[in-house]
């Protein structure tokens, strides 16, 4: 309720009407409810990834796997940052695009250096596939004027890489969380717990 009240107040003071704040863009414009369909599903992929990781990190059972808990938290937070960026078009409209992409690259390199063994043990192929697809999306985004195709075709390829990358990321997050539960169940079984 507090978030709702604060959001209303901030947006009203910024000049938005109640209708603009409360109603879906498709309702306001009279457009189809499927306007931005794949983009919206992409945001849901990021949100689901973050929720899976953070829930898994929060349920306990990490006596001997603190590094894995840290990895779940970092991957979960990165997923939510990607969701917010994608939903609000932060790197497209409000923040320097190259700086945002550089931050993502640096964070990914730090993850690889610090957690390489864990990532490869859990689901290295999914992590590298998702990362590769997302890197291709960024590459196409940064170089779209250099391709000898019209904007619509280049955008389709770029968004396709991003969407499939986000879906692969969700799969990786699922594997990361399930690995944590499998490992926890295995250790309970070895200790004779039920």
What is the predicted role of each segment?
Residues 1-193:
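Polytopic alpha-helical membrane-helix bundles and their juxtamembrane interface segments
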């Amino acid at each position: 309720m507090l978030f709702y009240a604060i959001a209303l107040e901030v947006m009203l003071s910024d000049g938005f009407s109640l209708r603009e704040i409360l109603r879906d863009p498709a309702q306001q414009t009279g457009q189809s409810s499927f306007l931005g369909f794949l983009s919206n599903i992409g945001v849901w992929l990021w949100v689901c990834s973050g929720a899976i990781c953070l829930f898994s990190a929060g349920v306990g059972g990490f006596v001997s796997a603190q590094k894995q808990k840290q990895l779940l938290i970092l991957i979960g937070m990165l997923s939510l940052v990607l969701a917010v960026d994608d939903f609000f078009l932060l790197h497209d409209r409000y923040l320097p695009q190259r700086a945002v992409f550089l931050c993502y690259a640096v964070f990914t390199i730090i993850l690889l250096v610090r957690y390489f063994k864990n990532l490869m043990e859990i689901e290295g192929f999914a992590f590298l596939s998702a990362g590769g697809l997302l890197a291709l999306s960024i590459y196409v985004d940064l170089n779209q004027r250099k391709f000898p195709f019209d904007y619509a075709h280049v955008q389709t390829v770029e968004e396709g890489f991003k969407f499939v990358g986000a879906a692969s990321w969700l799969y990786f997050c699922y594997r990361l969380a399930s690995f944590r539960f499998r490992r926890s169940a295995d250790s309970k079984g070895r200790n004779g717990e039920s």
